[in-house]
Amino acid sequence: MKKLLIFPITAAMLLSLVACAQSAKPDVSLDTPAQEQTVSGSTQIPNPWESYDTADAAANAAGFTLTAPEAISGSSAKTYRVMNSGDGEVIFEILFETGADGEHAAYIHKASGTDDISGDYNDYAETETLDVNSRSVTMKGNDGLVNLALWTDGGYSYVLNVSEGLSQSDMIALVAEIQ
């Protein structure tokens, strides 16, 4: 009797083991939007930035304007972008590009509110707060050069980030032009 029970129990255990050992394949269909597709177990996230040909088109998408200098650090090639998170947070960005390598010399951000929207988490050796056109501007940098300027004005947060750093007087002049 025991021998009769051992065979069916062993067969059931082997079938269970084989069924459990099968790896689940991700379900990717052509009807699934790109942001929801799963490839190799990871979800692909779309680029949140939308590029625009002109400052006016970007301002229309953002719902507010951003006035910037003509050039920063010798770069006048600009890319206008807007990021709309969908929860009411909108960031208007102007990138000043350095060339074909896709690097940028500087960027300017503007968004509603008073939060730090720089996205720059570097530790700077020097931090100073100055008055520029009746705005309290925090400048951060290293070795006597300023890389980052942050301020708020009229219910908006602003950021000017310059990759190579500028003298404090040059950064003040640029901040004065941004609205």
Where are the regions a protein language model picked out?
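N-terminal hydrophobic targeting segments that direct proteins to the cell envelope
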Residues: 25-35
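Short, solvent-exposed recognition patches
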Residues: 36-146, 153
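Conserved short hydrophobic interaction patches
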Residues: 27, 65, 174-178
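Surface-exposed amphipathic alpha-helical segments
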Residues: 154-179
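Bacterial signal peptide processing site
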Residues: 21-23
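C-terminal motif of bacterial Sec signal peptides marking the signal peptidase cleavage site
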Residues: 16-19
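Positively charged n-region of N-terminal signal peptides that target proteins for export
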Residues: 1-9
